[in-house]
Amino acid sequence: DIPSLDLTNMVMQNADIILATGGPGMVKAAYSSGKPAVGVGPGNTPAIIDDSADIRLAVNSIIHSKTFDNGMICASEQSVTVLESIYKKVKEEFLYRGCYFLKPDELEKVRKTILINGALNAKIVGQKAAAIAEMAGVAVPPDTKEQLQVLHRR
């Protein structure tokens, strides 16, 4: 089929969940579809790991993408959604590969460091995860590859 708005709407009506990337029109259409939707704009790339995934490969790919150039490329993952049935294995793999899961109080410190008055703090751009944590007053191992936070679990 040739891509079209009609075809896109048909796919959205028959999907269980919609992951909409691209311009504001596409994201708005996904949110208006009546289906659960994750809408992202430029530079907010999500990843979804389901139970058919090769967990080791998925986690390694996400880390490789996110740590290349310290996440400067807008195509690097900004969020990861994981099925509950494989959550523990995925978390263990992230930990095994040098990632750090922020505790709630640490998350608040990091948030206040990366966002100042609702705008991105330019001082964190292109910095390694451990450097951002240090700026926030959070102690992480110096070889930490990425800082992660569990935002919602069901």
Describe the function of each predicted region.
Residues 15:
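An anion/phosphate-binding loop that grips the pyrophosphate of nucleotide cofactors and donors
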Residues 18-30:
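Glycine-rich phosphate-binding loop
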Residues 10-11:
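Structural alpha-helical scaffold elements that stabilize or flank donor/cofactor-binding regions
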Residues 6-7:
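Short acidic active-site motifs
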Residues 27-154:
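ALDH superfamily catalytic-core signature
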